[in-house]
Curated annotation (Swiss-Prot):
This peptide is involved in the control mechanism of the synthesis of the erythromycin resistance protein. InterPro entries: 23S_rRNA_methylase_reg, Leader_Erm. This is 23S rRNA methylase leader peptide. The lineage of its organism: Bacteria, Bacillati, Bacillota, Bacilli, Bacillales. GO terms for biological process: response to antibiotic. Keywords: Antibiotic resistance, Leader peptide, Plasmid. It comes from Staphylococcus aureus. Pfam families: Leader_Erm.
Amino acid sequence: MGIFSIFVISTVHYQPNKK
């Protein structure tokens, strides 16, 4: 699986950036 990994990493890396 790779799509799920990208989705999780994207969200985790976007969460703190959207602060």
